[in-house]
């Protein structure tokens, strides 16, 4: 998932936009049927290009996102996302520490919970 943290609010950048572009490309090339494309749910399936042998080029969204000073780009893995609420993320991000300190606090908050999926905790924060 990708978010922009702006003015005390976490704005979810549509997680399906890259998946939709990939599906459209596969259908157009005849590598995926339209029926199969319709069955794919971007909430139930994760498509990870990192480390894939068949990864050829990055997908670029046609949707432009204008960043503002003091925005924070927040990228999370599914494992982290399942173990912390948006509200909890906002409460930590609003403190405005350095990104490294904020990332540590988010990871530690998740680790304190007794939840499943803690082996897949990934987080990237980019301050603008």
Where are these regions (language model features)?
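A short, polar/proline- and glycine-enriched secondary-structure boundary/capping micro-motif
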Residues: 4-6, 22-26, 85-86
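A broad, low-specificity signal marking well-ordered, structured residues that form hydrophobic/aromatic
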Residues: 10-11, 44, 124
């Amino acid at each position: 998932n990708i978010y922009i943290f702006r003015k005390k609010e976490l704005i979810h950048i549509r997680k399906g936009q890259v998946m939709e572009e990939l599906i459209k490309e596969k259908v157009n090339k005849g590598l995926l049927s339209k029926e199969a494309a319709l069955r794919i749910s971007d909430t139930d399936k994760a498509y990870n290009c990192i480390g894939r042998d068949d990864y050829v080029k990055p997908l670029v969204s046609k949707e432009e996102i204008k960043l503002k000073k003091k925005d924070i780009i927040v990228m999370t893995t599914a494992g982290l996302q399942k173990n912390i609420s948006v509200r909890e993320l906002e409460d930590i991000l609003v403190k405005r520490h350095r990104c490294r300190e904020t990332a540590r606090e988010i990871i530690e908050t998740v680790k304190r919970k007794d939840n499943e999926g803690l082996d897949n905790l990934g987080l990237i924060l980019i301050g603008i």
